[in-house]
Amino acid sequence: MLGLNHTSVSEFILVGFSAFPHLQLMLFLLFLLMYLFTLLGNLLIMVTVWSERSLHTPMYLFLCTLSVSEILYTVAIIPRMLADLLSTQRSIAFLACASQIFFSFSFGFTHSFLLTVMGYDRYVAICHPLRYNVLMSPRGCACLVGCSWAGGSVMGMVVTSAIFQLTFCGSHEIQHFLCHVPPLLKLACGNNVPAVAPGVGLVCITALLGCFLFILLSYAFIVADILKIPSAEGRNKAFSTCASHLTVVVVHYGFASVIYLKPKGPQSLEGDTLMGITYTVLTPFLSPIIFSLRNKELKVAMKKTSFTKLFPQNC
């Protein structure tokens, strides 16, 4: 489907966790707990949104879709990572490596696009409240969600097809704990590598920066409108609807900038592994915590839903 270039390399060896030989069991237990918490946290958000009629609004529809993208992103990466921590054979087949890159980039960029859509939703709600029902109609929301998923899939296809059209020769050890673009490019050879490497980086950075700048622009208008509210209580109430989203944006793009905008130069295997862990494990882990703690309406609804499921006879 992606026109992959099957070279003499039939598999790769993931060596990222070899930098921490004495910590692998502890890391396995830690990442397993974080993985389960991420899944359960996002599932609880989804169940709460769908079971509480008061949350059937565009903002919570987007949040529910964001939870789906986070679940799929973690499922695409972490189970394989957990298996490698318990194994001495950390080989990954050529096609499995391509699939991991495709799904991780697809769901990762879908997450970024959905955060952008949520920023636009907050902009419309605060700056154009009288037109909110028109601009954020069910059809319009479905279109925004569909475009986010389609955009993520296109990004995944572009990156995967560009990388796996290259020829891989020499060493087949990936200096990472998952199939990741920069260490894969170091294994590629051929005349087209100098063009593909900056091209892929430019596409990814442009997409991320475009989303980030759109969110910044949305919040610039939001802050300007909030400052016009005369009462402090009104300003706090308006800003509270944005606090959880803004916090997740800072976490998401903060960790993403570490991965994609780090300066060129010699990098240690330990440093690359730790930076990768922050983005692939820690970011999805923090997201449901932030939304459940900083969104008062969602927090109350989650408590109600949890109580109903645990003690149905008392409801």
PLM feature spans:
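Transmembrane helical core of 7TM receptor-like proteins
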Residues: 1-315
